[in-house]
């Protein structure tokens, strides 16, 4: 009996949780993915298609899909939505001109049937840059308070230093099993 329980427990504990990392090009998605994985900055080039890595946090396994954010690739984001539990939206906090596009993409995703149960973590990236928008400013502009059907959290961060990233992952792990 104990062996059966142990096997079931190990299956439950090692369950992978699918995460998509999205955002406009040059927001810092790939840098964040590899900060999660290696805790260091790696040289990146624009992602064509996707990168996928498994990240383990406190025995919780996340399968993270970093999806290219160029305009020509955004129409294919929906091919990654199936079975997604978490959306990480990376926002470039200094790119005020394209925040309206980010907002459009966010609400397009939230309306998609395959993401109806997904929780949303918004990383307000590049907080180390002079003149950046605060997480509160981004939250207000994206009207995050109007999102009622999805749990969400906004977190200030700096992908280059890793500041704020652990807090975002902790929020995600706290959401496991909460629906």
Swiss-Prot record:
Lipid-acceptor residues (N-myristoyl glycine): 2
SUPFAM superfamilies for the chain: P-loop containing nucleoside triphosphate hydrolases
GO biological process, alphabetically ordered: intracellular protein transport; protein localization to Golgi membrane; vesicle-mediated transport
Coiled coil: none
InterPro entries hit by this protein: P-loop_NTPase, Small_GTP-bd, Small_GTPase_ARF, Small_GTPase_ARF/SAR
Gene Ontology CC annotations of this record: cytoplasm; trans-Golgi network
Residues the record lists as binding GTP: 23-31, 66-70, 125-128, 159
SMART domains: ARF, SAR
Keyword Iron-sulfur: no
Keywords: GTP-binding, Lipoprotein, Myristate, Nucleotide-binding
GO molecular function, one term: GTP binding
Family the entry assigns: Belongs to the small GTPase superfamily. Arf family.
NCBIfam families: small_GTP (TIGR00231)
PANTHER family attached to this UniProt entry: ADP RIBOSYLATION FACTOR-RELATED
Function in brief: Binds and exchanges GTP and GDP.
Protein name (Swiss-Prot/TrEMBL): ADP-ribosylation factor-like protein 5B
Organism: Homo sapiens (Human)
